[in-house]
Amino acid sequence: MIGETLAKIFGTKNSRVIKSFRPTVNHINELEPKYQAMSDDELRAQTEVFKKLLADGKTLEDILCDAFAAVREASVRTLEMRHFDVQLIGGMVLHQGNIAEMKTGEGKTLVATLPAYLNALTGRGVHVVTVNDYLATRDTEWMGQIYRFLGMTVGTIVHGLDDDERQEAYNADITYGTNNEFGFDYLRDNMKYSRGHFVQRDHHFAIVDEVDSILIDEARTPLIISGPAEKSTQLYYQVDVVIPRLREEDHYTIDEKARTVVLTEEGVKVVEGGLGVDNLYDHKNMEILHHVNQALKAHTLFKRDVDYIVKQGEVIIVDEFTGRLMPGRRYSDGLHQALEAKEKVKIENENQTLASITFQNYFRMYEKLSGMTGTADTEAPEFKKIYDLDVVVIPTNMPMIRKDYPDVIYRSKQEKYEAVINEIQELHRSGQPVLVGTISIDDSETLAKMLKKRGVPHNVLNAKNHEGEAQIVANAGQAGSVTISTNMAGRGTDIKLGEGVKELGGLHILGTERHESRRIDNQLRGRSGRQGDPGSSRFYLSMDDDLLRIFGGERMSKIMDTLGMEEGEPIEAKILSRGIENAQAKVEAHNFEGRKHILEYDDVMNQQREVIYRQRREILSGESLRPNIEAMIEDLTEGIAAVHADDRTHAKDWDWEAINDDMYAQFGIRVQVDDEIKDKIKSQELGDILYQTAIEVYDAKEKSIGSDQWRNLEEYVMLRTVDSLWKDHLLSMDHLREGIGLRSYAQQQPLIVYKKEGFEMFQEMIDKIQEEVVKLLFFVRFEEEPEKIEEIKPKEQEMTFSHGGDQAVKKKPVQRKDDKVGRNSPCPCGSGKKYKKCCGA
């Protein structure tokens, strides 16, 4: 009551925001005669004028009024449509990076042209996001007339385009497309092996049409690209035949503490002979080498009935801490398949995640995000919390005169359907068009059968019958028309009233059930009463409806009994309407928590995804990877020194054999240190010696085939390793996510555990990338002409597309020119810090 009184005196926040735009609207209107007086060529030339103003230091705000006035005039000349004042306000709301709630028929599509043109003047591209290919294509052709008139280019992203077509569309000033296509293109770009093949530009500015549908309704379903983990299981069987021939010590050595196993030189020869391979470490045989290593682990490090059991033809992991079986969990990186080959059971192909992202995290990448919809105000808190978007309700151009009648409630669904059919028949006889909204395909088909029996002609629009959607919706306003539609069908297409329909009361909306969300109900109502047209709406409900049955509970039934309802008799009561609204509020709160929950988990993956994608882009940048490789070699040699060298004992007493074994396992080299040096060497100096030895070997390998070819190989090996281990990490994170809910039984917070263990797994993957990259580069040998190396690229994988924190700035490793500075030595830059904490970080 007090709030209402204050609102009357001071106005609501929304009314104050709208009022603040009025002076700008007035200025745009004052500019109208100036632009009307221009010739077509003069008007078109304004685009270059605006671009020059921006180049000279003006801001978008400085040129907003002129740009909007130019778009308005171009629209009049091309489409014969003039932007209303309220549409100018909508354009300003979008430009500011907020959500404009505009009722159906208020021209959201036309509104988007204003901020799209203005922001495209920067040359960085604008993405206009729609819910389906039809709307993306329609809006490109329709609104594209305005942009092209003003000298702008327009592109469309729809399903079925090849990369060249996509690249061309993204390079346009303004690009229309669906949310799915934009998201999948981002994921696909980050799986490519050349920057020249990327299709997307920066994520600069996005205008999301039907923003509630895309950012809220679809937020619970991530975009996923998946593919078979292995194309064939045959290689596992072939390798498994060879491994049992190997003998410990002669052919391989085991480090039980580190749980690693390494082939000896003799072992490599046996494997090469058994598989008919000339050189196991040739770059062509990297996949075979990976299978050999996994099979070797399966046979030597993993024991049946200790690490796993075989039950009903399946290899089931045993939890090492609890001893419990973990059905459904699988080792990653091909190890599980190697165990299946070892145990002679069926090798299962895994369809694993190759890349995924939620819409929440995709759209939060844009520097500026905005949206339009007819219904957003009910979800305003969620838009603010998740996306930092304010919702501004734009006034209608003409007063809304639609009559929204109270709900009528029946005891059973059958009684409700009978009443609905009677109402439709009566409206059809009078000639008033009716749009019947259902919440399921099943309901729409049930009503269609009942109407057919009564002989009432009608159209049905649902997911099974979506061909000609736009035509069916467009005809729904003709006299005598009966259209049965699922609630979300036909969004984006206006229902225009046919001749004589206004006199009959306009389009009548008949809802057959309340949706879980008030917003969806409002969308259905909003199909009627556009642009000041007459119209009406009413919902028919029953106690059998899911919403009332599940969330209304016994209380609603008791109220019905108290009111003394007879069979077939409807009831209208405010207390029931309040009960329905309370039920909807409960569901909306529950769904919000679900979406927030998904986002909290995906935020963990998002931070990791950003690191990997940034690393891939650095690899593909064309800059030399030599400094990165040197830093990896340094870390690994220092690690070996740290494990085996202790300054508390004399260097002669260090385990030199173990040092050499580790150097051989990682680099394929052995280090000879004179006794004279051993008398005075310290652990840090050992790290320097190991590093220098490794670098000399690395330089020799590079020299043998030439620097340019070696750079190509470095890029190939790093990409292949990052992609392979990232793919396996995604699978491991999927498994962790699936089982994390059970941690609550152990009095643990699942999200906290997921963050902690996910970070540990990610750190392990980063370490493994370093080890694998260096090992492959040191062990690779060439039997063919070196110039063929540049042709090597990882194989494209079969892919399936399903709709299902602060970034640290990475310093580039310092490239050494003179003698190496010890990691613990003072930094030569003079900061006073240790080198590893300063320039060597």
UniProtKB/Swiss-Prot annotation:
InterPro entries: Helicase_ATP-bd, Helicase_C-like, P-loop_NTPase, SEC_C_motif, SecA, SecA_CS, SecA_DEAD, SecA_motor_DEAD. Residues 518-538, 796-832 are annotated as: Disordered. One of its GO terms (cellular component) is plasma membrane. Its main location: membrane. It comes from the Bacteria. One of its GO terms (biological process) is protein targeting. Pfam families: P-loop_SecA (PF21090), SEC-C (PF02810), SecA_DEAD (PF07517), SecA_PP_bind (PF01043), SecA_SW (PF07516). Keywords: ATP-binding, Cell inner membrane, Cell membrane, Cytoplasm, Membrane, Metal-binding, Nucleotide-binding, Protein transport, Translocase, Translocation, Transport, Zinc. PROSITE patterns: SECA (PS01312), SECA_MOTOR_DEAD (PS51196). Its EC number is 7.4.2.8. ATP binds at residues 87, 105-109, 494. It catalyses: ATP + H2O + cellular proteinSide 1 = ADP + phosphate + cellular proteinSide 2. May bind 1 zinc ion per subunit. It is a peripheral membrane protein. Zn(2+) binds at residues 827, 829, 838-839. CDD domains: DEXDc_SecA, SF2_C_secA. Monomer and homodimer. Part of the essential Sec protein translocation apparatus which comprises SecA, SecYEG and auxiliary proteins SecDF-YajC and YidC. Part of the Sec protein translocase complex. Interacts with the SecYEG preprotein conducting channel. Has a central role in coupling the hydrolysis of ATP to the transfer of proteins into and across the cell membrane, serving as an ATP-driven molecular motor driving the stepwise translocation of polypeptide chains across the membrane. NCBIfam families: PRK09200.1, PRK12904.1, secA. Belongs to the SecA family. This is Protein translocase subunit SecA. The gene is secA.
